[in-house]
Amino acid sequence: MKKISAFIVFVLIAGAVSAQRDLAYKWSVTAEYGLSSLDGDGDSYIKQVYGTSVEYAFLPFAGIALDYYYFPLGGPAFTTNVNAASVNLTVNVNRLFFLDTDYKVILKGSIGYGIAGYTSKYISSTTPSQTSVSNSASSFPVLSVSVEYYLTKLFSVGAKSQFRPFNVNNLEGDPRYNLDNVYNDNIVGATLYLRFKFSNPD
């Protein structure tokens, strides 16, 4: 937590120092598609993931993004549908260190807080029974790293990896995993995305 707090403070201080520069405030939206998997207690398949995001760049190297993802997870004994959203601080690493330099390829990172609603269906392998669970969860820190390539001044494409830890232990819906004070369910994903900018980059 101290390292995360120090990182956020560093970004804000750097923003204040460069605030006198001619800043470009931009909105952008993305559409994403890729693969994801549940890192939980049981075996999990690699499944598809769909997502979208809206980002506001309040500094040339930093922004606030709101994202939404649909994760249709599954495994040999369960199916789980997760609707997840998060608000994130995004950082353009290239511009953080070289503010006045333009790049065709950029490296971005983000950290955020998320919430999710999910429905799980578990089928027992030992008895002919089925368990369904609907619940909510929170995620912190939601982490992502992406590489983005500018096609034009308005469009870019990218590849993103993300990690979402949850404050629950039973996204599979298996009653055996209903343990107190155990939080080890995570979603990992990799997506390709298309970004549209409403105003030209610097």
What are these regions (language model features)?
Residues 52-60, 121-166:
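Extended low-complexity acidic/polar segments
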Residues 19-55, 63, 118-120, 197-199:
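Short glycine/proline- and aromatic-enriched beta-strand/turn motifs that initiate or cap beta-hairpins
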Residues 1-24, 197-202:
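Cleavable N-terminal export/targeting peptides
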Residues 56-127, 136-140, 188-200:
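Gram-negative (and chloroplast) outer-membrane scaffold detector with strong preference
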Residues 46-47, 81-84, 124-130, 174-181:
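Flexible, surface-exposed loop regions and adjacent strand-edge segments
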Residues 39-43, 76-78, 98, 130-135, ...:
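Outer-membrane beta-barrel domain signature
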Residues 29-35, 66-70, 109-115, 147, ...:
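Transmembrane beta-barrel strands of outer-membrane/channel proteins
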